[in-house]
């Protein structure tokens, strides 16, 4: 009886930990989306830098996750490698926009951030 109870607890903890992991990916996606809106509406470099910095952290964290569509794939599968590569592209684009924001070029940073939407849309089609 005790072994059965321990087995049930072990399995349920794995189920709940994977569910919370998926929520983390969802939270990171929400952070990316919310802060992209901030970048688009910002009127000063400080707002843009703050939003882009939050986006960068969320993208790096999300890159470690596995989307529900790829849960049956191994971490080194071509699909998972492509999923992570999408975040490499996204982080590079965020860094480009952040560089412009650090130079006080708000409009240019906002224009550079528009590329994020193209990347988002492309990878959402594949993995969402």
From Swiss-Prot:
Cited Gene3D superfamilies: Cytochrome c/b562
Entry keyword set: Electron transport, Heme, Iron, Metal-binding, Periplasm, Signal, Transport
Disulfide bridge map: none
The organism's place on the tree of life at top rank: Bacteria
Keyword RNA-binding annotated: no
Protein localization: Periplasm
Quaternary assembly: Monomer.
Binding site for heme b: 29, 124
Gene this protein is translated from: cybC
Reported function: Electron-transport protein of unknown function.
Entry-linked InterPro entries: Cyt_b562 (IPR009155), Cyt_c/b562 (IPR010980)
GO MF annotation list: electron transfer activity; heme binding; iron ion binding
GO BP terms: electron transport chain
Similarity annotation: Belongs to the cytochrome b562 family.
GO cellular component: periplasmic space
Signal peptide: 1-22
Requisite cofactors: heme b
Species assigned in the record: Escherichia coli O157:H7
Cofactor annotation comment: Binds 1 heme b (iron(II)-protoporphyrin IX) group per molecule.
Main location: periplasm
Name of the featured protein: Soluble cytochrome b562
């Amino acid at each position: 009886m005790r072994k059965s109870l321990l087995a049930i607890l072990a399995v349920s903890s794995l189920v709940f930990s994977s569910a919370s992991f998926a929520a983390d990916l969802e939270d990171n996606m929400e952070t990316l989306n919310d802060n992209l809106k901030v970048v688009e509406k910002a009127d000063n470099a400080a707002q843009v830098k703050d939003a882009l910095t939050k986006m960068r952290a969320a993208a790096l964290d999300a890159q470690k996750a596995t989307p529900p569509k790829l849960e049956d794939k191994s971490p080194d599968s071509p699909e998972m490698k492509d999923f992570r590569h999408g975040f490499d592209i996204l982080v590079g684009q965020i860094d480009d926009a952040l560089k412009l924001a650090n130079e006080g070029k708000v409009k240019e940073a906002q224009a550079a951030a528009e590329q994020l939407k193209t990347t988002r849309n492309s990878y959402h089609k594949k993995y969402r």
